[in-house]
Amino acid sequence: MLMFSRFRYIFFAVALLSGPVCAGARADLSAFTRGLKTLQGHFSQEVIDTQGRVKERSNGTVALSLPNLLRWECDAPYKQLVVADGKRVWLFDPDLNQASVLLQDNEERNSPLIALIDPIQLDRKYDVSEEVAMRDGLRWLSLRPRGSTEASFQSASFGFSQTQLARMELVDNLGQRTVIAFSGWQRNPVFAVNTFRFTPGKNVDVIGDR
């Protein structure tokens, strides 16, 4: 269930793709977000502990619909599904036949999403900077919480390759690093009506804020 504790990080991507706050400051981000309403692609993720050891690897597909809909589906090594429908965030684990659910507003309030879409909060809570040198062939935009913010991370970085979002790197408050590489982006696909919905089956054990 490590991914469930990190799903809020994906709201970084949703917030960045919403555009108005950060896009004007960074040419790559501006080009990537221009005219964007929906997005679909593939991801591979590694969680690395403070000793540099890989604790978790996963890969799958991600779908976004601005401003706040998300489908994050792990295909390997284990099936797992996260759906944010605008009101709730669902995590479904088919192996356990269990679904956990949280109110999306509560999670967003405790995540950088609210700051990224609110310029006043962004300036108050975070230092946003562009890394001077390229790293791994990418141009990087970095966020770091200021002062006593309640953010659940130490730093976040977004790597761009030729105006495409290629990577996210996040360091949590325990010093663990999550690295997510993206590929195969499709811009503005038309999604089926149930893409961002989750309805638990009758025999699914549901835990949380229904």
From Swiss-Prot:
Transmembrane segments: none annotated. One of its GO terms (biological process) is lipoprotein localization to outer membrane. It is found in: Periplasm. HAMAP family: LolA (MF_00240). NCBIfam families: lolA. Keywords: Chaperone, Periplasm, Protein transport, Signal, Transport. This is Outer-membrane lipoprotein carrier protein. Monomer. CDD domains: LolA (cd16325). The gene is lolA. Residues 1-23 form the signal peptide. Participates in the translocation of lipoproteins from the inner membrane to the outer membrane. Only forms a complex with a lipoprotein if the residue after the N-terminal Cys is not an aspartate (The Asp acts as a targeting signal to indicate that the lipoprotein should stay in the inner membrane). Belongs to the LolA family. GO terms for cellular component: outer membrane-bounded periplasmic space. The keyword DNA damage does not apply. It comes from Xylella fastidiosa (strain Temecula1 / ATCC 700964). It holds the Pfam family LolA.
